[in-house]
Amino acid sequence: MIATPIRLAKSAYEPMIKFVGTRHPLVKHATEVVVHPCATNGMLPGSKECIPVSKFMENYKPFRVVPIKHSANAGLSSSKTSVFVNRPLQKDELASIFELPARFRYKPINEHELESINSGGAW
C-alpha cells in the first residue's frame, strides 16, 4: 500500500485560499416600507398619491424619426450632415496630431509590451 494517501487522509484539510481581514457584518434591512430619501412630500411607494406606471407612460409618445431638412444652397453636399470649411488655423489649433508636444503624442509599443500582448498577458 502507498503511504501517501494514508498520510494525506490523516492530516486535516486546510484550504489554500486565505481571506484577509474579518468577516463583513450582516446589514439589517428595514422590514417595513419607508420613505425614499429623494421622495417629495414623504410619499410612500404604493400609496394613493403615487401614479401607476401604466398611467404615467400614457403621457409619453413613441419615438418618431424626423428627417433632416437640408438647405437649398448646399448643392452637391446635401447628403452630408457636415461640411468642410477650409480656414486658417487659429491660436492653439493644430493641423495634425504629430504637431503635438512630445508628452501628448502616442508612444510606440516596445518589444517587451508586444511580447506580453501576443502571449495573452502571461509571462
From Swiss-Prot:
Belongs to the alpha-ketoglutarate dehydrogenase component 4 family. Residues 1-8 form a transit peptide. Disruption phenotype: Decreases OGDH activity in vitro without destabilizing the catalytic subunits. It comes from Saccharomyces cerevisiae (strain ATCC 204508 / S288c). Component of the 2-oxoglutarate dehydrogenase complex (OGDC), also called alpha-ketoglutarate dehydrogenase (KGDH) complex. The copmplex is composed of the catalytic subunits OGDH (2-oxoglutarate dehydrogenase KGD1; also called E1 subunit), DLST (dihydrolipoamide succinyltransferase KGD2; also called E2 subunit) and DLD (dihydrolipoamide dehydrogenase LPD1; also called E3 subunit), and the assembly factor KGD4. Within OGDC, interacts (via N-terminus) with E3 subunit and (via C-terminus) with the complex core formed by E1 and E2 subunits. Present with 2050 molecules/cell in log phase SD medium. Pfam families: Kgd4-YMR31. It comes from the Eukaryota. PANTHER family: 28S RIBOSOMAL PROTEIN S36, MITOCHONDRIAL (PTHR31601), ALPHA-KETOGLUTARATE DEHYDROGENASE COMPONENT 4 (PTHR31601:SF2). This is Alpha-ketoglutarate dehydrogenase subunit 4, mitochondrial. Molecular adapter that is necessary to a form a stable 2-oxoglutarate dehydrogenase enzyme complex (OGDC). Required for incorporation of the E3 subunit (LPD1) into the E1-E2 core (KGD1-KGD2) of mitochondrial OGDC, and acting as a stability factor for the fully assembled complex. Its main location: mitochondrion. GO terms for molecular function: structural constituent of ribosome. Keywords: Mitochondrion, Transit peptide. InterPro entries: Kgd4/YMR-31 (IPR020373). GO terms for biological process: 2-oxoglutarate metabolic process; tricarboxylic acid cycle. It is found in: Mitochondrion. GO terms for cellular component: mitochondrial ribosome; mitochondrion; oxoglutarate dehydrogenase complex.
